[in-house]
Structure formats: C-alpha cells, structure tokens
Amino acid sequence: MSPTDASPVVTRFAPSPTGYLHIGGARTALFNWLYARGRGGKFLLRIEDTDKARSTAEATEAIFAGLRWLGLDWDGDAVSQAEGAARHAQVARALQEAGKAYKCFTTQDEIAAFREAARAEGRSTLFRSPWRDADPASHPDAPYVIRIKAPQEGTTVIADQVQGDVRIRNDQLDDMILLRSDGSPVYMLAVVVDDHDMGVTHVIRGDDHLNNAARQMMIYDAMGWDMPVFAHIPLIHGPDGKKLSKRHGALGVEEYQAMGYPAQAMRNYLARLGWSHGDDEFFGDAQAQAWFDLDGIGKSPARLDLKKLDNLSGQHLGVMADEAIVAGAQGYLAATGAPPLTEAQETGLSRAMYCLKDRAKKFPDLLEKAHFILASRPIDPDPKAAKSLDTVSRGILAELTPQLQNASWTRDTLEGVVGGLAEAHGLGLGKLAAPLRAALAGRSATPSVFDMMLVLGRDETLARLSDATSA
C-alpha cells in the first residue's frame, strides 16, 4: 500500500547532529519544505541522534539555527530519534513474534570467518544465518541479535519519483539486523518506525540513501504499513563535477550567512540546484511553493555555482523591502561577530536604501556603500580616497561650501552648483566628484555624490566639507 492522492502530504527532514547544517542537507530540507507547503501539508523535523558518540547538543542547535535562518519553519516540535528506542525495539519484537524476524546467535567472529573464507573461495560474502529457520527449542542461552527475514526470491522494485523504477534482486538482500545484542535498535529500523509513526507520506532525501530503501521496504511490508513515496535526489557537486568538499568553498549554511547572502536568495538558489521550472531562475517563496514538484528534479548531480548565487542575491536585494534589508544586515553583522547597527544607523540606512541596494550583491557590499551614512564625523578617508584630497581639491571644496549654504536642497540645484564650480575651474564633473566622495564618505567607490548629499542633508554635508577643507 502507499499514500493516496487524497492523503495529506507529510514530509520530513531528518539530519544527524554530528556537525553543521551542510549545504546539501539544507537543500534536502528546502525540497521537503517546498513540497509540503505547496500542498497544504506538514513539514516535520527529526533529529537522528542514535549515534551517541558523535551526536552533540551543539550540532543540534546549529541545525535549528541554520533552518531558522533559511526560513524553513517546521510543524510541531522536533523529534529525537533516540527517545523512541523503546518503540523501535517493540516493533522488532513484534516482527519476531510474528515469525517475520528471528533471533540469530551467530557471533561477529563467526561471521568474519565466514566472509574471509568466502572471499578466499571467490564466493558471495552475503551472510545467511543458520538460525533463520531454527527451532526455538534449540536456542542457546547466549547473546543474540534480531534479524528480519528478507525475501529470498523475486525482485524488490523501488518506485522512485526521481530515479524511476529501481529493481533489486531479493537474493542480494541480507537478513539485516533490527536489534543489536544489547537490545538497541539499528538506524534502519528506527527510520522506518519513526517515519510510520510520524505519518510521513513522502520521503525526499539524497540518493546516497537509495540502497537503503529496498531494505527499509522490507520492514514496511513485514509490518503491513503503508509505503511512503520515495524521491531520492542527486547530490551536489563542485564546479569541477567532483563531490562537494572544503576545497570548493563554504559547506555549512552558517558560512553563507556570514558571507552576507540574504536567506531569500539562498532559498531561491538552493531550489534551482537540481530542480527546474522551465527557464525560470529568479522567484520568491510563493512561486517556488506553487511550482515545486518532484517531476522537475533531475537525475544528474547539480553543480555549485557561486557566481549564479551572487547574481540571484543581488536581484533579491534589489526587490526586498527596506525593513527586511535592515533586519538582514543586522543578522549578517551578528553572524560575523560585528557590533549591531544603532537605532540611528538603522534609520540612516533606511533613508539611504534607494541609492544602495540596486548594485549590491550581498549585505557586506551594501554596508560598504552605506559607509557614508553609517560613519560619524570626522570622516577618516581610506588611502585611495585621501589621494584625491590634495591642496588644490581642498581649495575648490572650500569654494563650494558657501555656494551650498543657501542653495535649495534638490538634485537639480545641487547638480547645477557643483557642475558650475567644476566648469569654472575647467574641470569635468568627475574630477570634482572624487574629492567630494572623499570628503563625504571617505571612500572612492560610493553612491552618487548627489544622492549622498540628499541623504546626509544640508547641515551634515556642510559640516563634512568643513572638516575636509580645514584638515
């Protein structure tokens, strides 16, 4: 059995808390979130923390923080897989009592010896337990594991929504362990029990789990449970087509936040990594949720392309509401450990936004362009800007100050006054703009000098010119 079209969609993201939220895991979470949200379903979060030696509370919090930054809200409380160990063991015992699983007393040393001999003789190393059909009366008083009785004939077909039908001969499946000799459940059992108990209808995960699906299907069949829809998505590779690694750049979601990408841009970019909707590249959440379907996921690995991410990031900054940009900038500063913007700086940034966001790719670009409004007097020019404030330039700026004193503070008037002064000295406007930028912003790359003057206002502009000419 499998979920019907009428079943409410329930997806899940189930990371192991052994490190940061990987960019590949973030995309898996996004695909699950989009699929559920676009169908009015639920997106659940399960922390697969059964490996106590490697699982940490810090990693769990990093996963939560990464998902929150990405804006991937989950329904209900996050589930701890480790807390369900008793339930997982209960299912294994039920299968044993139903004759669909059995106690195996073969030791690890015996299995190792079998496999070594099989390799030496060129035989299959697939272990077949002699205890599969043994009379319980013959069971020794010794440690045992519980194994499922795998089908030995026929074929298991994984009807995968991305990979297509994947066929695995059942004689290649082993009687996998469900309960270890210490009574603890194995990961493969825990995943299936949790997915069933959580009502998961669609398992969307990386294709590195594809081989697990056939073995997990055995448990669904043995328990008579509805089979979820499987969709195994290709992994993300680096620009060179090789498996993504540190040499390709950032791997953790928190690194992308610290680089200054807006979360909206990351969602857009990650959605396009392996999924497409025609030629659409730039879109928001509402469109992505409406468009996203499993049919649009390709089989080939997607390649990370930071230039494309930069372009999308710039497009999103260009259309974001000013207050959203200010909030995003504060988040970026927090992620890098920098001091937050003051209330006055937030106000100034909002006032200057119209001349900042069009050409910025990321938050650090925008904040650098906003230096003129975020900095306070006296402005300290950087080395490149300082070169334009020579004696001649300071003299011309000193002439400009009284001309601006009573000028109406409009773009046309300011352009006329500055342009007239440049012409009087036989200069092009650009020659006068350079020392003006240095005086007003302390930088050589800034928004238009007239935009800066309008944003700063008359008093602040004149004060900065006075500082520059009297230095």
From Swiss-Prot:
GO terms for biological process: glutamyl-tRNA aminoacylation. It is found in: Cytoplasm. One of its GO terms (molecular function) is zinc ion binding. A motif ('HIGH' region) lies at residues 15-25. Keywords: Aminoacyl-tRNA synthetase, ATP-binding, Cytoplasm, Ligase, Nucleotide-binding, Protein biosynthesis. It comes from the Bacteria. This is Glutamate--tRNA ligase 1. It comes from Dinoroseobacter shibae (strain DSM 16493 / NCIMB 14021 / DFL 12). Belongs to the class-I aminoacyl-tRNA synthetase family. Glutamate--tRNA ligase type 1 subfamily. Catalyzes the attachment of glutamate to tRNA(Glu) in a two-step reaction: glutamate is first activated by ATP to form Glu-AMP and then transferred to the acceptor end of tRNA(Glu). It catalyses: tRNA(Glu) + L-glutamate + ATP = L-glutamyl-tRNA(Glu) + AMP + diphosphate. Its EC number is 6.1.1.17. InterPro entries: aa-tRNA-synth_I_cd-bd, aa-tRNA-synth_I_codon-bd_sub2, aa-tRNA-synth_I_CS, aa_tRNA-synth_I_cd-bd_sf, Glu-tRNA-ligase_bac/mito, Glu/Gln-tRNA-synth, Glu/Gln-tRNA-synth_Ib_cat-dom, GluQ/Sye. Monomer. The gene is gltX1. The keyword Aminoacyl-tRNA synthetase applies. ATP binds at residue 246. PANTHER family: GLUTAMATE--TRNA LIGASE (PTHR43311), GLUTAMATE--TRNA LIGASE, MITOCHONDRIAL-RELATED (PTHR43311:SF2). The keyword Protein biosynthesis applies.
